[in-house]
Amino acid sequence: VYVDEFVGHDMETRLTLENDFDRVYHLSADVPNSKGVGGSQLTTGRSNPIQTIQALDFAARNKSHFIYAVSAMIYNTEHQGHNGPDLNEQEHIWPANPAGNIYGMEKLYNMQLAKEYAKAYDMKISLPIFHAMYGPHCDILENSKVVAAMCVKIFNAEDPGEMEIWGDGTQLRSFCYI
């Protein structure tokens, strides 16, 4: 399998490819949001850790570098909305109190699990933490994240008119174009 080949697979079941892989990228997750898109809290809380365990097991068997996409939702709720470049794991995640829902908690759990796999299987891991992702393939009608939500507000605003911007003006945001 080459980097430009897509392998469709239900990640809740064991991946049985018989190839050497330098890297395993685990970049997606089922994300519940305010518009009911994706699974329920229970569905995502069950499904995402299972998928991560399957990906970690595969990477461990293949001695692959494991790259897991972590979400800014892992940060303690006191630091949500202030996700600038000064955030760090020890000061802003612990004590654990992820924002919003089970999604942040399971992302934090999966990140910690990857660290344990790295120790147990002598694996190399990378854990990039992404903030506010957006791009041409994001469906603004089905995504309640800040960029999509602001686009919907702009489209629905009267001309000329006003629209509400959330927050008190002190929040910092990091955006990731995908």
Predicted features along the sequence, with ranges:
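Residue-level detector of structured alpha->beta connecting loops
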Residues: 20-22, 63, 122
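N-terminal Rossmann NAD(P)H-binding glycine-rich loop of SDR-like oxidoreductase domains
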Residues: 1
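Conserved Rossmann-fold NAD(P)-dependent oxidoreductase catalytic core, especially the SDR/UDP-sugar
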Residues: 53-102
